[in-house]
Each structure stands twice: as structure tokens, then as C-alpha cells.
Curated annotation (Swiss-Prot):
This protein's name: Uncharacterized protein HI_0077
Disulfide topology: none
Organism domain of life: Bacteria
Amino acid sequence: MTALITQFWQQVETALKTANPQEKCRLVNDLYDNLLPQIQLIKLEDFPEIVPQDNIAAFPEKPLLVAPKDVPKRSFATEEGYAATLHAIAHIEFNAINLGLDAAWRFGRNAQEELGEGLAFVKDWLRVAREESTHFSLVNEHLKTLGYQYGDFEAHAGLWEMAQATAHDIWERMALVPRVLEARGLDATPVLQEKIAQRKDFAAVNILDIILRDEIGHVYIGNHWYHALSKKRGLDAMKCFTELLHKYRIVIFKGVINTDARIQAGFTQHELDWIYEVEQTLKSYIKK
């Protein structure tokens, strides 16, 4: 591993270990814009060897993290409730920065070993982290115009808990974080934009336009690597995905399905129909 590659991975680790949101964003932007273009990751030895229990991602002291059921429900019609909604988006984006960094750091070596495409994998997930840092900054700055900032409301750790649950396997991570958790945002964002437009906060609507556009690309990246890994491992991508949904007791569709966005993000209509049918039985299974 050359000195430049060592410096690169040290900054990836530093960004992951940084709790301050603004400093984390600065480090991520520098990583993607300045360091990444200078390196070539060719050999397996160019990637760090990570074990599943390694977890170095840092989070700020605030927001206070609680169980999803314990996040206070506030009316969207009130200023505080509206700010809490934007805060929830900022929290998702902050977690997504760590998810992009962690994927590159944790699984780059696996992508090189299994597919011979470690550099492409690292570039993809650092691009995700870079764009998520922009999303976080946009939402947090807008939140400040309402008199609030990131950390002012409680939040939950559901997104990161799934990252920890899939820390042992690049294939499971690609299957469940971008294709399930991040893809839900494709469905939810247009509905939320309509509600925000009724408040005439068109700056927030425009921010969500940027987020939706980029998230389509992020889910596409997840789909690409999931299918590449499934093919390499000789797995039936749809059948095995169904088994994962049962294993983790996950329901994907929670309301309106944004079919157009999901297809742009790499799902096929056949796959979406398959998942929908599977979920009808899965919902009954989960209720038992």
C-alpha cells in the first residue's frame, strides 16, 4: 500500500470517526473531490481488511436517539412539527453519509476479492457519501431559517441498526440498505413534497427535488452491486431477496409506490410486482 493510499484510507477512517456534522461533511467532500482522483486501488492489499465487529462510525451527542416508537409525534401543521419533519430528513441524510463511508471502508476489499472491482465500488459509495453530505447541509441550513438546527429533536437509529446487522456481508448490505431503506425515500418524497408545497415552503420542495434525483442514483448503485454479487455467487437475485425479507421481517412498501423512480433506480416492473406479491404474505407472517 503506497503512502498516498494509506493517507486516503486514514482520511476515510477519520471521516467515519468524526461526530461533528460540519467537519464530517468537510472531510467527505475533500476525500471525494481531492484525494480519490489521485489514487489507484488495484491490488487486494490496497484495501483495509475489516471484520464485522469493527464499528468506528461516530454520531454527535445530539440528537438524542430513541426507539422509533418513542420518537414524539408532532403535528405537521405546527411550526415545531414541521421543523421536526425536516429534522428527521436531516437525520436520515447524516446517517447516509456514514453509510456511504462505511460501505467503501468495510466492503471495498470484498468487492475487489469477489468481483475485481474494488476501486469502482469505493468510488460509487464515496460519491454517495459526498452527495449525502450536500443533502444534509442543504436541509440543516434550511432548518436554521426556521429557528432550529440538527440535534434539536429526538431521532431514531433504525437506519444504522440495519447497517450493523449487515456488517458481515457485502451482499446483504447491498440488498437491504440501498434497495430497501433508501428506496423507501423514492416513494415517500413526492408525497412529502406535496404537503410541503401546501405550506408554500418552495425552497424545501426544491431541496427535496435534489435529494430525490440523487437518491435514484444511490439506489441504482445498490441495485447494480446487489445483482453483480448475486450473479458472481450463483444466487437467484429475486428468490434470495425474498428470503432476506423474511429473515429480517422487513416490509418494503409502506404506502404509495413511486414506480417510475424505482425503475429509474434499477428495479424492473417484474421485480416490483414480485416484491408486492411476496409482501402480501409477509405482512400476514409478521402479524403472527
